[in-house]
Design a protein with these regions (language model features):
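PP2C/PPM-type serine/threonine phosphatase catalytic domain
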Residues: 1-154
Length: 154
């Protein structure tokens, strides 16, 4: 996971330099599943939620955000001209059949009330149908771009 993060970091910096976008920054969340173990890496305010079929929220990443005078600013991001702190948080968890993993940008969780987000994640539907519901809710309630990946563990 560390090697994948380092590779992505170096590639993003190379592209930003070649495009004269040295003032850019981004957030990142990723998951790698091997057997019944998931490794989550994240930095910034993109999130990972893991819900257990019978137990509710098992895990949620903690945003790297400062709130100053009502404004949110990233305290850490994946690469940025402002900060050398690009070390992601990494955690490993055991998965069970029925668990659901959502990787998403802030446009998702800022557009959908948390309990509705969790309820929809656990709907007895195909992942693409759940993501269509998220798409509808973000179009209706959101004002940011949004991206999501939903994995259902069998």
């Amino acid at each position: 996971m560390n090697n994948a993060c380092l590779f992505a970091y170096n590639e993003l910096n190379r592209r930003a330099d070649s495009l004269k976008h040295a003032d850019m920054g981004t957030t990142m969340v990723m998951a790698s599943i091997e057997g019944n173990v998931v490794t989550i890496a994240h930095i910034g305010d993109s999130r990972c939620y893991i819900l257990r079929k019978d137990g509710g929220l098992l895990y949620q990443t903690e945003d790297h955000v400062n709130r100053i005078l009502g404004w949110e600013t990233l305290s850490r991001c994946f690469f940025s001209y402002k900060s050398g702190n690009v070390i992601p948080d990494i955690i490993q968890l055991y998965l069970e059949a029925g668990d659901r993993i959502l990787l998403c940008s802030d446009g998702i969780y800022k557009s959908i009330i948390p309990y509705i987000l969790e309820e929809r994640m656990m709907d007895n539907k195909l992942p693409e149908d759940i993501l269509e519901t998220f798409d509808f809710l973000c179009e209706k309630n959101g004002n940011d771009n949004y991206t999501a990946i939903l994995a259902c563990i069998e």
